[in-house]
Regions:
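Active-site neighborhoods and metal-handling regions in enzymes and metal-associated proteins
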Residues: 1-361
Length: 361
């Protein structure tokens, strides 16, 4: 964690920000290692404090040894009062707060308590998130394990699926397989969507039967030590029809073109275009209604985001970096028939990308 603190402190110095209050759970875990459900970090050029309540005192000692504990006691010593005390002690006049992760109620409580204090709150965005986009060796090792658990689960379950099973039964089988394979839990509610239901990119499993000869989208991932996997496959039980073969072939080719073209310094919207242009040329551009991919790590959706840029801003978007881990998931969705999506996770390397997902497709 010392390296992460050093990198954050360099960013704070560059921005002229003397301190940052880190409250987003994923950012808090990334910076400290603390996995509890309640707490915040105050990080300055010299100090690293963690505020949490009595439930987590022992846990902080185990998970966040680089941080000094300040215990929250409700209602006597809330976070806002502890923050004022620490700010005065550290001679702070400005503290950055994560604007995207502080609710109106939380901001009101902080502002009310600190109204007469010399400390000013400065809303900032994306500071820790930008550091998290490039994975270190420890993160990659955990991600590889989570992905392997996911791959093994879908590989084991698909041969067991039958047309007379429901979507919910299939989803449960996949969840059990990931638990038995070593996952802590699931990264998100598993999607199993058959036939017309698969035209909904974020469908939820129902009591509808899987059936024969129609598309079945499976979207799943194991969560391990805080890190997410994400995998989509489209299968067919029985003999697929001509339309399935055509749509599947287009989506698979689009994904392969994207994977072949990913590399550092490529703009994220240009990465999206690697697949989107092929799908559009095949006549299904309007049926590919989401971005090509998203970063995956401590959050299931994080940066970088591989999607179209706003008109006129195509040359101003963010670029891929070596160390990014991103999903690559083109899809085509036809109302009344169904959809096809194929998703793998890819690591951006020095000269291209490595496909981390290994399940058959």
């Amino acid at each position: 964690m010392n390296d992460r603190l050093s990198r954050l402190r360099a960013v704070l110095a560059e921005r002229g920000l003397p301190a940052l209050l880190v409250s987003a759970p994923a950012n808090r875990r990334y910076m400290s290692g603390f996995s509890g459900s309640n707490g915040a970090l105050l990080i300055t050029a010299e100090a690293a404090l963690i505020f949490t309540d009595g439930r987590y005192v022992i846990q902080v000692g185990r998970e966040a040894p680089d941080f000094s504990l300040r215990e929250i006691v409700i209602p006597d010593r809330p976070l806002s009062e502890l923050l004022i005390e620490a700010s005065v002690e550290l001679n702070l006049r400005t503290v950055g707060i994560e604007a995207a992760h502080v609710s109106v109620a939380e901001h009101y409580a902080l502002a009310k308590t600190m109204f007469d204090s010399p400390v000013e709150l400065d809303p900032v965005e994306g500071i820790v998130e930008s550091l998290r986009e490039v994975k270190d060796a420890d993160e990659l090792a955990t991600l590889r394990k989570a992905i392997a658990i996911t791959d093994a689960a879908i590989t084991a379950v698909i041969p067991q699926l039958r047309p007379d099973m429901t979507e919910r039964q299939a989803a449960w089988m996949l969840e059990v397989a990931m638990h038995e394979g070593g996952g802590d839990t699931i990264s998100f509610p598993i999607i199993v969507a058959a036939g017309p239901n698969s035209a909904l990119p974020h469908a939820r499993p129902s009591n509808d039967l899987l059936g024969e000869g129609r598309p079945i989208i499976i979207d799943m991932g194991a969560l391990l030590d805080g890190y997410h996997a994400d995998l989509s496959r489209t299968i067919c039980l029985g003999e697929p029809d001509a339309q399935f073969r055509t749509i599947y072939g287009i989506v698979l080719e689009a994904q392969q073109r994207a994977l072949a073209g990913l590399r550092p310094e490529l703009r994220c919207n240009a990465a999206d275009a690697l697949a989107r242009d092929y799908i559009t040329a095949a006549g299904y551009g309007e049926q590919f209604g989401h971005g090509l991919g998203h970063g995956v790590g401590l959050d299931i959706h994080e940066g970088p985001s591989l999607r179209r840029a706003a008109v006129g801003r195509e040359q101003n978007g963010p670029r891929l970096q070596a160390g990014n881990v991103t999903s690559v998931e083109p899809g085509i969705y036809l109302e009344g028939w169904g959809g096809v999506r194929i998703e793998d996770l890819a690591l951006i390397t020095a000269d291209g990308c490595e496909v981390l997902s290994k399940a058959d497709k």
